[in-house]
């Protein structure tokens, strides 16, 4: 173990999210320590290892060396989506705990394999959804579960970004990405709605389209989708790779409504506002390093030998739901969501 009170990590994948968010978070975490970094670019790995205090750096071909490092207790997987399962299972087979970026994998079958291998080697598996720890989202969850909004009826959520010219090519490669805007940003709408409702959807509908056929030959640019939950709750969701960056989440109940804006971006002031019984409320939440909270929560789960939240099953469910949305778009009909 890296230190008596800190879990040692190897960060696998040094793309944008790692460089701007995950690596800086290790500097401030009291429970997780960066030991090594792994990248396809050894010069970049060396530069970022030196910048952020990792003692060692490796290429993907040297991944086994990172897994054999005596101070590495866990891996944070932030590679392209299509390689999540491979790197996660190799880590688990080396008895390393796994924190994996969303989406968990490109298929339900890969997700199930990840869960089974982690279980067989008695290692923890967590999916990197920050909403479970971010204070504004937690406050909204508490408001919903308190019953003050009454019985939930409708949720609206969207996450849109405008991919700039020169964006990494893997975003447009179905084999590497698994999909387009739905799996990259729409997944937040899917996961957060399930978390708030406290139930899983039973039916999915979807519609996908693109305004740039030359740029989006393999994956979708825009998605509009609907999830039907038990007891009549419905989520209307949307995601885009071709709209200005924004995100929101609106929750409507019989007694009131609440909204979170922005809902999913990090390092921004969040507003939680709404109306209950004719009375307006609003609270602002200053930016907080959600990645530190995520790292600390996973490290604590490892130390206490308990299943983290959100675990691998939550990631699998989101992948299954998104596959149902895609199937609905292909077949132009609602698709039952089967999560048994």
Give each language-model segment a name.
Residues 191-266, 292-306:
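Contiguous beta-strand/loop segments that form the cofactor/metal-binding neighborhood of enzyme cores
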Residues 1-3, 74-76, 300-340:
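C-terminal helix-rich "cap/oligomerization" subdomain common to oxidoreductases
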Residues 18, 100, 125-127, 237, ...:
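Hydrophobic residues in well-ordered beta-strands that form the structural core
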Residues 1-52:
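N-terminal Rossmann-like dinucleotide-binding module
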Residues 113-131, 150-155:
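Rossmann-fold dehydrogenase core element
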Residues 17, 40, 284-296:
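Active-site loop of classical SDR/Rossmann-like NAD(P)-dependent oxidoreductases
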Residues 56-117:
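Beta-loop-alpha module in the N-terminal Rossmann-like domain of NAD(P)-dependent dehydrogenases
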Residues 131-216, 332:
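Predominantly a Rossmann-like dinucleotide-binding segment in NAD(P)-dependent oxidoreductases
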């Amino acid at each position: 173990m890296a230190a008596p009170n800190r879990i040692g990590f190897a960060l696998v994948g040094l793309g944008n999210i790692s460089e701007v968010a995950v690596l800086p978070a290790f500097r401030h975490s009291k429970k997780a320590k960066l030991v090594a970094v792994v990248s396809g670019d050894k010069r970049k790995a060396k530069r970022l290892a030196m910048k952020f205090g990792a003692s060692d750096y490796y290429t993907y071909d040297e991944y086994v060396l990172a897994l054999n490092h005596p101070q590495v207790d866990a891996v944070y997987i932030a590679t392209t989506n299509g390689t999540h399962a491979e790197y996660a299972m190799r880590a688990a087979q080396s008895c390393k705990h796994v924190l994996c970026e969303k989406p968990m994998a490109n298929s339900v079958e890969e997700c199930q394999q990840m869960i089974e291998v982690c279980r067989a080697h008695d290692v923890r598996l967590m999916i990197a959804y920050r909403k479970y720890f971010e204070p504004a989202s937690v406050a909204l969850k508490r408001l919903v579960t308190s019953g003050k909004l009454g019985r939930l009826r409708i949720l609206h959520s969207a996450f849109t970004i405008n991919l700039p010219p020169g964006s990494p090519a893997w975003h447009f490669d179905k084999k590497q990405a698994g999909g387009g805007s739905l799996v990259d940003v729409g997944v937040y709408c899917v996961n957060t709605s399930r978390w708030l409702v406290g139930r899983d959807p039973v039916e999915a509908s979807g519609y996908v389209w693109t305004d740039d056929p030359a740029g989006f030959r393999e994956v979708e640019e825009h998605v509009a989708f609907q999830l039907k939950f038990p007891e009549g709750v419905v989520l209307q969701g949307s995601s885009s790779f071709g709209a200005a960056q924004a995100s929101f989440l609106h929750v409507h109940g019989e007694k009131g409504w609440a909204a979170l804006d922005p809902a999913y971006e990090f390092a921004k002031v969040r507003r939680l506002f709404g109306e209950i019984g004719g009375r307006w409320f609003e609270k602002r939440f200053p930016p907080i390093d959600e990645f530190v909270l995520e790292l600390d929560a996973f490290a604590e789960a490892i130390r206490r030998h308990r299943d983290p939240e959100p675990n691998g099953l939550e990631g699998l469910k989101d992948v299954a739901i998104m596959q149902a949305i895609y199937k609905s778009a292909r077949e132009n009909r609602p698709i039952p969501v089967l999560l048994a």
